[in-house]
């Protein structure tokens, strides 16, 4: 796993947790939770690819991994749209920078998960 991606996730999560948006903080907490979940999923998928022999154990352990993958892509798309929306409505430069970095990270992670999944198929 790329150490820059890890630090990017951690940096964005810390920044988001410090933000006090005028909108519901529950929405932001939900985004943070989904970011954390996405990071864990990406990490576990990456580890599985690194140990290609684990693909069979992944299939045995979770026969619905394709369905899970599809759900993660839906979550990513939702997060991308939510981050884009937040980026459009915020006027605070700290928040704008945070959301721009979050958007870039989401696009990178989506690409990485696609690459991992193609290796597993």
Curated annotation (Swiss-Prot):
GO cellular component, one term: virion component
Compartments where located: Virion; Host nucleus
InterPro entries: Flu_NS2
A Gene Ontology BP annotation from the UniProt entry: exit of virus from host cell nucleus through nuclear pore
Alphabetical list of Pfam families matching this protein: Flu_NS2
Residue window of motif Nuclear export signal: 12-21, 85-94
Main location: virion
Keyword Iron-sulfur: no
Keywords: Host nucleus, Host-virus interaction, Transport, Virion
Keyword Nucleus appears in the UniProt entry: no
Purpose of the protein: Mediates the nuclear export of encapsidated genomic RNAs (ribonucleoproteins, RNPs). Acts as an adapter between viral RNPs complexes and the nuclear export machinery of the cell. Possesses no intrinsic RNA-binding activity, but includes a C-terminal M1-binding domain. This domain is believed to allow recognition of RNPs bound to the protein M1.
Note: Average number present in a viral particle is estimated to be 130-200 molecules.
Family membership noted in the UniProt record: Belongs to the influenza viruses NEP family.
HAMAP family: INFV_NEP
Quaternary structure (record): Interacts with protein M1. May interact with host nucleoporin RAB/HRB and exportin XPO1/CRM1.
Name of protein: Nuclear export protein
